[in-house]
Amino acid sequence: MTRRRWILAIVALVLVLGAGVAVAGYVVWQNRHPGTIRGSSTVEFETTEEPGATTRPEEVVRKVPWPTYGYDEQRTRYAPGFDVRPPFTTEWEKGTGSLLEFPPVVAYGRVYVGTNDGRFLAVDAETGKTVWQKTFDRCIAASATMGEDVIYQPLMDPFPCREHKQDAAGYVVAIDPDTGRELWRFEAGVVETSPLVVGNLLYFGSWDKKMYAVDVNSHKAVWTFPTGDQVKAGPAYARGTLYFASYDNKVYAVDARTGKLRWSASGTANFYATPTIAYGRVFIGNTDGRVYAFGQDSGHLLWAKATGGYVYSSAAVWQKTVYVGSYSKRFYALDAGSGDVRWSFDAGGAISGAPTVLDGVVYFSTLERKTFGLDARTGKKLWTFDDGKYSPVVADKERVYLAGYKRLYGLLPDAG
């Protein structure tokens, strides 16, 4: 072969290899940044009942207005009949001295919240004064949940929690909400999930790669369900089925009484978000930058919407719209049927925590420590507050309670 042919052969080989590298690189990029899959409102889409349409009795709501992370068993983050709108006056504020990574629950005239440095507080809802405080030697990075006159708080690994030892023990502690006295505890791996009580069963996930169902009367596990990786997000419940996700890139639906698998579905990266159940669908964000909609009964992928950044945020739902934030610094209102964008809002900072919808206003915070209240129909900015970082807002029928970075606020709607 002549020298010229050698050169041409080498050039051709380089071009082929270069093309192969380019294709491989494109495939890797696509896997890490998958695109949008548009859905349809004609497939597995139930519109006969809005989230919150089957409400709890009024006397129960007055007693326990915000019982769990995400407000209800379906984690819809929409509270019907809570007519509290901006502008607000700060009625009280309370320093906690440590990060509030997850929002409080509200019951019995008190606001219950855990701090990252292991303190669990009961705060008077009207005055902001501490009623009691219980200190643990473990970090807290999850909301509590209310049962029948018992409040359950998850605990992570021992201090310093930043070491995150994978084999460390964690607990869910049952506490008397009136006195703060510990009633009993259940040991598992590290518990970062916000638990849920349905009937006599307490559900939560753990870093030991399992979902647990614990009988609150016997304090024993009724069943456990193994996954392929850590379970960091909380479960949701609807129609006898428990829905949850794992860091093994999967969403699971299991029989809530037996733990038997009904279906599983996959994403292309980790699921940190807690699922939201509405309209016959399961809505959940993924660190691949997409929001997914799966069929509640089938597990079929119905749509996936790319947001341009990680989606750690759990979703809120209201009036056939899915509300969710992204690390792309944008907050989205998506059509629950198709996944199409109804509107989006440039928040100026990455969004990690979950939104809340109250009286037509959707609230969320950015990692820049700013909270927004937007018109949920149009995306118009109605209100801002210079604190808040993760999932900021819960409420009762008199006030909004805002979890700031290291402060808790009681906000009263302005008269008129």
Predicted regions and their residues:
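Blade/loop signatures of beta-propeller domains
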Residues: 53-90
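Short amphipathic
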Residues: 93-95
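Ser/Thr/Pro/Gly-rich low-complexity linker/stalk segments immediately outside membranes or between
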Residues: 28-52
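N-terminal Sec-pathway targeting helices
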Residues: 1-17
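Short, C-terminally biased terminal segments at protein or domain edges
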Residues: 18-28, 41-43, 72-74, 82, ...
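A structural motif specific to WD40 beta-propellers
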Residues: 91, 129-132, 181-184, 220-223, ...
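Short loop/turn segments that connect beta-strands within beta-propeller blades
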Residues: 124-128, 176-179, 215-219, 255-259, ...
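Repeat-blade elements of multi-bladed beta-propeller folds
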Residues: 25-31, 60-71, 97-119, 138-172, ...
